[in-house]
UniProtKB/Swiss-Prot annotation:
GO terms for biological process: proteolysis. GO terms for molecular function: cysteine-type peptidase activity. It comes from Hemerocallis sp. (Daylily). It comes from the Eukaryota. This is Thiol protease SEN102. Glycans are attached at residue 353.
Length: 360
C-alpha cells in the first residue's frame, strides 16, 4: 500500500534587512503597463529568473496582480505587518501553495490514525513562570536561516532546527545539521520532498543520530541514502515529546526552555509576501507547513508574538523569520501554531567519535 504524502534591536535590524532584500516600488511603477513591465524586468534580474517570451507574458500578468495586492495592503495605515515583492512575485498563490506549503500535516496524521499528546510533558510542572520574552538566536542556539527550495522538506528543516537548538543548549556547541540525511534516509513513513512529519523525524534521529550539514549538504531533491554517513552520526537525541495541543501557555513554557517544532497553515497571500511586523492576518488551521519557534516577546504596544524560523531563505520575511501573533482567542493559536508542537529530548552525550566543530 502506498504511503500517504505528509508532509528587540535585533528584530529592528532584521526588518531593515528584509526590506533591502526585496524589490521596492512606488506609485510611479504602477502608473502604466510599461512601468510595470520595467518593474517586472527589474524583479527578474534581481532574482535571476529566466523565462521564454510566452511564459514571460503569462507570468507578467500574475506579477501585476501580486504587485497590486501588495500595494493595496501596504496602504492600510493600521496594519501591524507589511508585505513585500519577494522571490514569489510572479507565482500564483496556488503554485506557491503546492510548492512551498503542500504538506497536509494534520490530514495525513489523521489518515494514519496517530493520536497526539498521549504521553507526558516534561515542562508541565516547571516551578517558575516562563520569562516575559526569550530569543534563542541571542543565546546562540539557532543556526542561520536555510532554504528548502521547491522541495516539500519543511518537516526536515523544522526537525533539524529543534535538534540544533537542544544540542547547543546541552553541549554549548552550535552545529549545523543535515536536513538532506532526513530527506534521503528517513523513508519508513516520511517521503522526502513529498512531505513528512517532525515526530517521525525525531524518532529517526533517536535511532540513528544525525550528521552535519557540511558532511551531507542539502540538495533540494530526493536522493539515495548515504549509508556511510548514516553510520557516522555527530549529534544524538534521546527521544521527543509533544506539547499539549491547543495550549499556548504550555507552548510558551516549552519555548522558554528550547526551540520547538510546530506546524502551521502558511499558504495564504499574507504568508507568501510577508515582509515585517507581527503577522495578524487571515489564516486557517489546515496545517501545511513545518517551522520552528525560536522565541517569543511583545511589541511596545503590547502585541504578543512568537518568533518563528522559516525555511524559505533569508530574503523572505524578517531575514527568514516571521513574528506571529501570540495569545489569540482561538486556543489553536494563529494559523494553528499550538495544534502540533513537539520537541526533542537530549540527556546523553553525543557519539564519542563525533566532531562537532562545524561551519555555520
Amino acid at each position: 500500500m502506498a504511503k500517504p504524502k505528509f508532509i528587540a534591536l535585533a528584530l529592528v535590524a532584521l526588518s531593515f534587512l528584509s526590506i533591502a532584500q526585496s524589490i521596492p516600488f512606488t506609485e510611479k511603477d504602477l502608473a502604466s503597463e510599461d512601468s510595470l513591465w520595467n518593474l517586472y524586468e527589474k524583479w527578474r534580474t534581481h532574482h535571476t529568473v529566466a523565462r521564454d517570451l510566452d511564459e514571460k507574458n503569462r507570468r507578467f500578468n500574475v506579477f501585476k496582480e501580486n504587485v497590486k495586492f501588495i500595494h493595496e495592503f501596504n496602504q492600510k495605515k493600521d496594519a501591524p505587518y507589511k508585505l513585500a515583492l519577494n522571490k514569489f512575485g510572479d507565482m500564483t498563490n496556488q503554485e506557491f501553495r503546492s510548492k512551498y506549503a503542500g504538506s497536509k500535516i494534520q490530514h495525513h496524521r489523521s489518515q494514519r490514525g496517530i493520536q497526539k499528546n498521549t504521553g507526558s510533558f516534561m515542562y508541565e510542572n516547571v516551578g517558575s513562570l516562563p520569562a516575559a520574552s526569550i530569543d534563542w538566536r541571542a543565546k546562540g542556539a539557532v543556526t542561520g536561516v536555510k532554504d528548502q527550495g521547491q522541495c516539500g522538506s519543511c518537516w526536515a528543516f523544522s526537525t533539524i532546527a529543534s535538534v540544533e537548538g537542544i544540542n547547543q543548549i546541552k553541549t554549548g556547541e552550535l552545529v549545523s545539521l543535515s536536513e538532506q540525511e532526513l530527506v534521503d534516509c528517513d523513508t519508513s513513513y516520511n517521503e522526502g520532498c513529498n512531505g513528512g512529519l517532525m515526530d517521525y523525524a525525531f524518532e529517526f534521529i533517536q535511532k540513528n543520530g544525525i550528521t552535519t550539514e557540511d558532511s551531507y549538504p542539502y540538495a533540494e531533491q530526493d536522493g539515495t541514502c548515504a549509508s556511510n554517513l548514516l553510520n557516522s552520526p555527530v549529534v544524538s537525541i534521546d527521544g521527543h515529546q509533544d506539547v499539549p495541543a491547543n495550549n499556548e501557555n504550555a507552548l510558551m513554557q516549552a519555548v522558554a526552555n528550547q526551540p520547538i517544532s510546530v506546524s502551521i497553515e502558511a499558504s495564504g497571500y499574507g504568508f507568501q509576501f510577508y515582509s515585517e511586523g507581527v503577522f495578524t492576518g487571515r489564516c486557517g488551521t489546515e496545517l501545511d507547513h513545518g517551522v520552528a519557534i525560536v522565541g517569543y516577546g511583545a511589541t511596545r504596544d503590547g502585541t504578543k508574538y512568537w518568533i518563528v524560523k522559516n525555511s524559505w531563505g533569508e530574503e523572505w520575511g524578517e531575514s527568514g523569520y516571521i513574528r506571529m501573533q501570540r495569545g489569540i482567542s482561538d486556543k489553536r493559536g494563529k494559523c494553528g501554531i499550538a495544534m502540533e508542537a513537539s520537541y526533542p529530548i537530549k540527556t546523553s552525550a553525543n557519539p564519542k567519535n563525533s566532531s562537532t566543530r562545524d561551519e555555520l
